[in-house]
Amino acid sequence: MAGGGRAAVGRRLLMAAALALAAALSYGLSDFFGGILSKTRSVWMVTTASQLTAAAATAIIALAAPGDPGPADFAWGAAAGIAGAIGISALYRGLSRGRMGVVAPISGTGAALVPVVVGLASGDNPSPLAWTGIVLAFPAIILVPQAGGKRAPVATGAGYGVVAGLGFGALFALIGQIGTDAGFLPIALTQLVVAATVASVAVALHQPWLPRGRGLAPVFAFGLLGTAALVCFLLATRAGMLTIVSVIAALYPASTVAMAAIVLREHIGRVQFLGLALAAIAVVLVTVG
């Protein structure tokens, strides 16, 4: 009986790691295609339209697989939406004023660190092997977005990177607080709040945000990747420890870099390759541990 129980726990943890990895892949692909779409469209419009699409798709999933969410679950979902919008807005502002090699690593580190702290405070107790993977994940997160060329001053965009990291980290941590029987409606609210908040920021900055014109189909498809990412992450938190699944999900820049190399033939430098290798080792250790 004890052996069967341990096997069931092992399968559950493996499923959590697989779902977190699927979330990381979806987030990475979302960033890749979002970056391409934003070259010809307003990033604020792309974000607003994609989040509205994601909210609608998640609501459909919620109707197909209903749960029993309470007021607290919707409160966590709404708070996560505000945090996510802060993260997105700060990231875009940081990338427009500083270098990706400064902003992205700082934001990625914060996205992993905040839920790790929250998970540990909530009683998560990873194994020594999993801890090794968690420790390796942080340099991977920092190294993967690095590009060659001149190094920018660390202060350039660093403040926005910190705010973005805190926002994304809070998003992960808050999603992890949604009840296991709450279904998916709370995260549909998350995406709706992100869309409304980002649109409000765009209005305040006098930036175009309203989806209009032709060629919106790719933007809507981009939104479905956001649905997949958030649904997979929510399911991962229900199957495993927030400490572990958030670290795996925060490795999403690795899939963005890999897609850029495969599709756009962008060169992967030695530093980035080291980051990708560390990310792969971290995922294996966290999963096995």
Predicted regions and their residues:
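Membrane-interface interhelical linkers
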Residues: 3-25, 33-34, 38-79, 89-98, ...
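Structural signature of hydrophobic alpha-helical transmembrane segments
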Residues: 13-26, 67-84, 124-139, 183-195, ...
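Transmembrane alpha-helical core positions of polytopic small-molecule transporters
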Residues: 27-28, 54, 80-88, 111, ...
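Hydrophobic/aromatic residues within transmembrane alpha-helices
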Residues: 37, 46, 94, 99, ...
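Signature of the 12-TM Major Facilitator Superfamily
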Residues: 45-49, 102-106, 131, 185-189, ...
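Alpha-helical transmembrane segments of compact multi-pass small-molecule transporters, enriched
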Residues: 52-58, 106-120, 193-197, 229-232, ...
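Hydrophobic transmembrane alpha-helices of multi-pass small-molecule transport proteins
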Residues: 58, 113-118, 129-146, 271-288
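Selected transmembrane alpha-helices and immediately adjacent juxtamembrane segments
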Residues: 155-185
